[in-house]
């Protein structure tokens, strides 16, 4: 009888453990990206001095200053990098141009590329990396413009950010 009792206890004990040793599904998620090594950014800051502009020249809608050239340069692009994209961002006003944060009123900032395409907030431009020099350049130009006319005296200040991505 003792033997039967021991077997019964052993069977019950095993049954209890088997219930707790059930398998569970496990999911392992692995993430990552393979990206091209970045180029060296040579033009870390570009300052454009528009000089003194005269209100008498900025009274008519669409009046603007002369263009001022800007070149954003990248060097030492690795062989795996074939193109670079620049995305421009900045504060805009209700005209869609970059907002003048200075004290002059009715003045906006216009940015264009070397093909005369407008580069407004969120726009991008892609250039091919030179296969021999491994460099990339973004020739741009900026000017002050008065969309509605009647520009007032004051300062002109705008900040346009550039974010690069590599392909």
Swiss-Prot record:
Pfam families: Fimbrial. GO terms for cellular component: pilus. The keyword Signal applies. It is found in: Fimbrium. It comes from the Bacteria. Residues 1-23 form the signal peptide. InterPro entries: Adhesion_dom_fimbrial, Adhesion_dom_fimbrial_sf, Adhesion_dom_sf, Bact_Fimbrial_Adh_Pro. Keywords: Disulfide bond, Fimbrium, Signal. Disulfide bonds join 39-77. One of its GO terms (biological process) is cell adhesion involved in single-species biofilm formation. Belongs to the fimbrial protein family. This is Uncharacterized fimbrial-like protein YdeR. It comes from Escherichia coli (strain K12).
């Amino acid at each position: 009888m003792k033997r039967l009792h021991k077997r019964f206890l052993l069977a019950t004990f095993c049954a209890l453990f088997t219930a707790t040793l059930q398998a569970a599904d496990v999911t392992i998620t692995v993430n990552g990206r393979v990206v091209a090594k970045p180029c060296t950014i040579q033009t870390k800051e570009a300052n454009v001095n528009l000089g003194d502009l005269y209100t008498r020249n900025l009274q008519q809608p669409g009046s603007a200053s002369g263009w001022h050239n800007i070149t954003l340069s990248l060097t030492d692009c690795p062989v795996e990098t074939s193109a670079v994209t620049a995305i421009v961002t900045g504060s805009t006003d209700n005209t869609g141009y970059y907002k003048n944060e200075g004290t002059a009123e009715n003045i906006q900032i216009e940015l264009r590329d070397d093909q005369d395409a407008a580069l407004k907030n969120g726009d991008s431009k892609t250039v091919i990396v030179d296969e021999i020099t491994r460099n990339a350049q973004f020739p741009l130009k900026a000017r002050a413009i008065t969309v509605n006319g009647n520009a007032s005296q004051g300062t002109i200040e705008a900040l346009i950010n550039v974010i690069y991505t590599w392909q």
